[in-house]
Amino acid sequence: MASAVARLDKLKLINPPAWLPSNTMFEGWTGSVAYGASNDASDMDVVGFAMPPKDILFPHLAGEISGFGNQIQRFDQYQQHHVLDKSSGKEYDIVIYNIVKFFQLTMDNNPNMVDNLFLPRRCVLHSTEMYEHIRDNRKLFLHKGAYHKFRGYSLSQMSKINKGSNR
């Protein structure tokens, strides 16, 4: 499958930074689609990561000196919610992370980020050689702290279910 960000950008349904569609390294279906719990009314959750241009990733290359003068706007993530594609009848929620933030969250064993490394192939919308290398080595991200992170995440999700919350 092709990149959802590139397709929605081409349809002018989203307005990401100009460099984002061509620098996205990975996109995947998450949420109900990934867990096989979606239906025709489900929104389509797309999560991924991108490699910003080097002057955004390393602001000193653009002449920025931290704390002096005009500061370059940082890129941590691009997100847009409730994007309605009338041609497909689907609504999208999109979050594309800066590769640095993605790695930080993944190395912290954030359950939502680790999930992206273990998505079923059918849920990988767009991947590059870089993502495939990361995916091939995904178990290296896991450590003993994962137990506590996933346990806490599971308990919070059960609490939401018991309270009848959807989010």
Predicted regions and their residues:
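Short, flexible coil/linker elements and helix-boundary hinge sites characteristic
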Residues: 12, 43, 137-138
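Helical scaffold of the NTase/Pol beta-like nucleotidyltransferase catalytic core
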Residues: 1-31
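Conserved NTP/Mg2+-binding pocket subregion across the NTase superfamily
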Residues: 70-167
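Residues in well-ordered beta-strands of folded domains
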Residues: 28, 47, 103
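Alpha-helix initiation/capping motif
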Residues: 1-2, 53-54, 110, 128
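General "foldedness" signal
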Residues: 16, 38-41, 58-60, 113-116, ...
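Catalytic metal-binding acidic patch
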Residues: 35-71, 76-80
